[in-house]
Amino acid sequence: MSIPVDYGTMTEIQMQPDEVEYITGCIKAMGPEGKMVEWGSGGSTVKWLETMTDQQKLVTIEHSPDWQMKVSGYINTRSDINDRFTYIFKPELYGYQHGYSNINEEHPHGLDDYLVPNKNILDADIFLVDGVARATTALLMKFLSTKEDPIIFIHDYYGRERWYSWAMQFFSKSEKVGHTLVRLWK
């Protein structure tokens, strides 16, 4: 199930309502200058920005030129949320195509600058991993994040547990949120 929206060419948030509600609750609980980092973008990106206060920030890291154009094209028309947003576009390198909804998307090859594009992202309060190489990205945030215990999510975890199970052993705790989202603790 997705959530219908009217965000230009984006007509849905590809998450369950209870997952969006949980994440927006976490955003509201961040400090007044809180930061969220997400890998992968879409209608949910706009929802996170609409939920944030003026001083909170969202950094989005995207590898897909199509999604980058859709999301940035829409957000650039919204002066009320644009100042909260930093978009980092890091396309796949070396000709590797990760694809969608198949195990190939989990391979970190060609994502040299995508996984950790700069160290400024490491102080976030929330990390939402919803792009490619999700297990690798979540694990890097566990070890590299500068906060004592940030919120780390992997979207679409449930239903693809075998893709991510190798990384789960390194987290102290995990909790199912909604239908497909998992929250992880350092």
Pin down the residues of each PLM region.
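Glycine-rich phosphate-binding "P-loop"
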Residues: 1-17, 25-29, 93-116
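Long, low-complexity, Lys/Arg-enriched
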Residues: 2-9, 13-17, 69-72, 165-176
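SAM cofactor-binding core of SAM-dependent methyltransferases
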Residues: 13-97
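Intrinsically disordered, low-complexity segments enriched in small/polar residues
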Residues: 29-32, 40, 108, 129, ...
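Short, charged, surface-exposed secondary-structure boundary motifs
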Residues: 67-74, 96-99, 161-167, 183-186
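Internal catalytic-core helix/loop-beta-alpha segment
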Residues: 85-140
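C-terminal substrate-binding/active-site "lid" region of AdoMet-derived donor-dependent transferases
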Residues: 118-121, 126-186
